[in-house]
A protein has these predicted regions:
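Sec-dependent signal peptide cleavage junction
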Residues: 28-41
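Extracellular interaction modules
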Residues: 17-18, 143
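Bacterial N-terminal signal peptides
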Residues: 18-31
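Cell-wall polysaccharide-cleaving catalytic domain and substrate-binding groove, primarily
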Residues: 38-162, 170-237
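Short, intrinsically disordered, low-complexity terminal segments
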Residues: 9, 21-22, 35-38
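N-terminal secretory signal peptides that target proteins for export/translocation
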Residues: 1-14
Length: 237
C-alpha cells in the first residue's frame, strides 16, 4: 500500500507532547467548526488531530513540497504527490461512488497538466475546496478512513485482539495519525514492535499504548531517508 504523507523527523518526546496538546485542544474547543449530522460529527473526531496539525483542517491546503520526500502535498491530510496519492484519491472518489464528478474534475486537471500536479490541478483543487469546502473535507476524510484507518483497525483486532473501536478517542486518533503517517502496513509494523516488546500490551491503558506507539514512530522517522528531510518537514506529525 502506498504511503500517504511525507515522513517527518521529530524526536519521540516531541511527538508525544504534540499528540497530547492536540488532543487537549480537541476536547476543550473542538477542531472542526462545521455543520454536520451527529454521525458525521462523531466520525470526524477520529482523524481530527492529524488534520488539525497537518493543515489546520483545511481541505484546500497545498504545500510547496520544498525539502519534502513526499513532494507537494494536498488537502487536510496532506496527500503526497510523489506517491500519486492525490490521483489515487480522485480515482477513489469515482470508484467508491462518493463523488464521481469531483474525482473526474481532478483527473481531467491532472491530465491537462501532462499527468503531473501542476497549475491546472492546483487551481481545480482549490476551486473545489472553495465551492464545497465541507463536502471536500468529508471526501478526504472518507478516503483516509476507507483506505488506511479501517484496514489497520481490522488487522489490529485480527492479530492482537485490540478492538480500537471500543477504545478511547485518544487511541483512535493515534492509530489514525500513525496510519496516515506510515501507511497501514507501517502502522501495523509499529504495533508489531509493541507486541514483540510486550505481548500483553493490549491490556495496558490507552495512554500508555499511545505513548509507546509514538516512541516507536519517532524511532522510525529518525532513520534514513527521512532523517535527511528539511527542518520545516521535521516539524510535522
Amino acid at each position: 500500500m502506498k504511503k500517504i504523507l511525507k515522513k517527518p523527523i521529530v524526536h519521540a518526546p516531541v511527538l508525544r507532547r504534540l499528540c497530547y496538546v492536540m488532543l487537549a485542544a480537541l476536547m476543550i474547543t473542538g477542531v472542526f467548526v462545521i455543520h454536520t449530522s451527529a454521525a458525521e460529527a462523531d466520525d470526524l473526531l477520529i482523524g481530527s488531530v492529524s488534520a488539525k496539525y497537518e493543515s489546520n483542517g483545511n481541505p484546500a491546503t497545498i504545500s510547496t513540497g520544498a525539502g519534502d520526500t513526499g513532494g507537494k502535498s494536498y488537502g487536510a491530510y496532506q496527500f503526497a504527490s510523489s506517491y500519486d496519492v492525490p490521483y489515487t484519491f480522485a480515482q477513489w472518489c469515482i470508484d467508491s461512488g462518493s463523488d464521481a464528478a469531483i474525482g473526474q474534475q481532478l483527473i481531467n486537471a491532472y491530465r491537462a497538466d501532462g499527468n503531473t500536479y501542476g497549475a491546472q490541478f492546483d487551481s481545480t483543487w482549490r476551486s473545489i475546496a472553495a465551492a464545497q469546502s465541507q463536502h471536500f473535507l468529508w471526501l478526504q476524510h472518507g478516503y483516509i478512513k476507507a483506505q488506511y484507518y479501517d484496514p489497520t483497525v481490522s488487522q489490529l483486532y485480527s492479530r492482537y485482539g485490540l478492538n480500537v473501536n471500543a477504545r478511547s478517542l485518544t487511541l483512535k486518533n493515534a492509530v489514525w495519525s500513525r496510519a496516515v503517517q506510515h501507511g497501514s502496513g507501517g502502522c501495523l509494523n509499529l504495533f508489531a514492535a509493541l507486541y514483540a516488546a510486550d505481548p500483553s500490551f493490549v491490556s495496558l491503558d490507552d495512554l500508555t499504548i499511545v505513548t509507546r506507539l509514538y516512541e516507536e514512530s519517532g524511532a522510525v522517522v529518525n532513520t534514513p531517508p527521512y532523517s535527511n528531510s528539511q527542518p520545516i518537514v521535521k516539524a510535522n506529525v
